[in-house]
């Protein structure tokens, strides 16, 4: 029985901490949500442009290497 309690204790502590975290969290208000959404969109756009320019630079380099 002692082994069962010893085995189940980490799971029980994790569940207890998780429930406490969920109860403490709050939903973002409209302004905060918009700020997060805009920051995420800007990040996606920047990463997209970086990928586009890297691809744009590597296409001619690849054609030079493969073309010869």
UniProtKB/Swiss-Prot annotation:
Residues 62-68 are extracellular. One of its GO terms (cellular component) is Sec61 translocon complex. It is found in: Endoplasmic reticulum membrane. GO terms for biological process: post-translational protein targeting to membrane, translocation; SRP-dependent cotranslational protein targeting to membrane, translocation. GO terms for molecular function: protein transmembrane transporter activity. Residues 1-32 are cytoplasmic. Keywords: Endoplasmic reticulum, Membrane, Protein transport, Translocation, Transmembrane, Transmembrane helix, Transport. The keyword Cytoplasm does not apply. The chain crosses the membrane at residues 33-61. The keyword Nucleus does not apply. PROSITE patterns: SECE_SEC61G. Pfam families: SecE. It is a single-pass membrane protein. Necessary for protein translocation in the endoplasmic reticulum. Heterotrimeric complex composed of SEC61-alpha, SEC61-beta and SEC61-gamma. Belongs to the SecE/SEC61-gamma family. This is Protein transport protein Sec61 gamma-1 subunit. It comes from Drosophila melanogaster (Fruit fly).
């Amino acid at each position: 029985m002692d082994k069962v309690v010893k085995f189940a204790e980490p799971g029980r502590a994790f569940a207890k901490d998780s429930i406490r975290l969920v109860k403490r969290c709050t939903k973002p208000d409209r302004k905060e949500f918009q700020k997060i959404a805009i920051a995420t969109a800007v990040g996606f756009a920047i990463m997209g442009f970086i990928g586009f320019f890297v691809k744009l630079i590597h296409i001619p380099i690849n054609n030079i290497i493969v073309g010869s």
